[in-house]
Amino acid sequence: MTTEDHSYKDKKVISIGIVSELTGLSVRQIRYYEERKLIYPQRSSRGTRKYSFADVERLMDIANKREDGVQTAEILKDMRKKEQMLKNDPQVRKKMLEGQLNAHFRYKNR
């Protein structure tokens, strides 16, 4: 396993109510995105949905695209395309991670 596999961003520990507060999305919208296969929460033994920080980021990205008028089918298509590129090309993965880090530090240092 890589270090990334153990990242706090990937641990599914956040309830749907908290995700709703963090993203500004309604619980219904979050469930809709799950139905459309845009997000994959983990289910506890009691059936409670649990999300990760990476899921929260993904939901915010989805919400921004929806505000721009992008349909959910197109968002899903783009997400799958991006995931495939990451799997197939380590250089693309490295560049994307570098871009995310640069964006994070630029935002943090404002």
Swiss-Prot record:
Task: State where it is primarily located.
Answer: membrane
Which positions does the record tag as DNA-binding? 16-35
Annotated HTH merR-type domain ranges read: 13-81
One Pfam family, please name it.
MerR_1
Gene null: resulting phenotype: TnrA mutant is impaired in its ability to utilize allantoin, gamma-aminobutyrate, isoleucine, nitrate, urea and valine as nitrogen sources. During nitrogen-limited growth, transcription of the nrgAB, nasB, gabP, and ure genes is significantly reduced in the tnrA mutant. In contrast, the level of glnRA expression is 4-fold higher in the tnrA mutant than in wild-type cells during nitrogen restriction.
Which PROSITE patterns does the record match to this protein? HTH_MERR_2
Q: Which GO terms describe its cellular component?
A: plasma membrane
Q: Which UniProt keywords apply?
A: Activator, Cell membrane, DNA-binding, Membrane, Repressor, Transcription, Transcription regulation
The subcellular localization recorded is: Cell membrane
Summarize the record's induction comment. Under conditions of nitrogen excess, repressed by GlnR. Under conditions of nitrogen-limited growth, it positively regulates its own expression.
Q: How is its activity regulated?
A: Under conditions of nitrogen excess, the DNA-binding activity is inhibited by the formation of a stable complex with feedback-inhibited GlnA. The presence of glutamine and AMP increases the inhibitory activity of glutamine synthetase by more than 1000-fold.
**Role according to the record:** Transcription regulator that actives the transcription of genes required for nitrogen assimilation such as nrgAB (ammonium transport), nasABCDEF (nitrate/nitrite assimilation), ureABC (urea degradation) and gabP (GABA transport), during nitrogen limitation. Also represses glnRA and gltAB in the absence of ammonium. On the contrary of the MerR members, which require longer DNA sites for high-affinity binding, TnrA requires a DNA sequence of 17 nucleotides as minimal binding site.
> What's in the misc comment field?
The amino acid sequences of the N-terminal DNA binding domains of TnrA and GlnR are highly similar, and both proteins bind to DNA sequences with a common consensus sequence. In contrast, the C-terminal signal transduction domains of TnrA and GlnR have no homology.
Q: What is this protein called?
A: HTH-type transcriptional regulator TnrA
State the organism of origin.
Bacillus subtilis (strain 168)
